[in-house]
Amino acid sequence: IRTHTLPCKCHICGKAFSRPWLLQGHIRMHTGEKPFNCQHCQRAFA
């Protein structure tokens, strides 16, 4: 039983999320965006 709504929907695959920041991280999976870099090894992360 769901107790919350899922107002944030991915325009690419239709998956729904309860929070905008969860949707933002999910969209990065589709786009391949990796905005965070390690200061030690320069590896990029989503």
UniProtKB/Swiss-Prot annotation:
Gene Ontology CC: nucleus
Zinc finger annotations (C2H2-type) as residue ranges: 1-4, 8-30, 36-46
Compartment(s): Nucleus
Main location: nucleus
InterPro entries, per database record: Snail/Krueppel_Znf, Znf_C2H2_sf, Znf_C2H2_type
Signal peptide range: none
Domain of life: Eukaryota
Gene Ontology molecular functions: DNA-binding transcription factor activity, RNA polymerase II-specific; RNA polymerase II cis-regulatory region sequence-specific DNA binding; zinc ion binding
The entry's keywords: DNA-binding, Metal-binding, Nucleus, Repeat, Zinc, Zinc-finger
Membership in a protein family: Belongs to the snail C2H2-type zinc-finger protein family.
PANTHER family found in the cross-reference section: PROTEIN ESCARGOT (PTHR24388:SF54), ZINC FINGER PROTEIN (PTHR24388)
Protein name: Escargot/snail protein homolog
Species of provenance: Cryptops anomalans (Centipede)
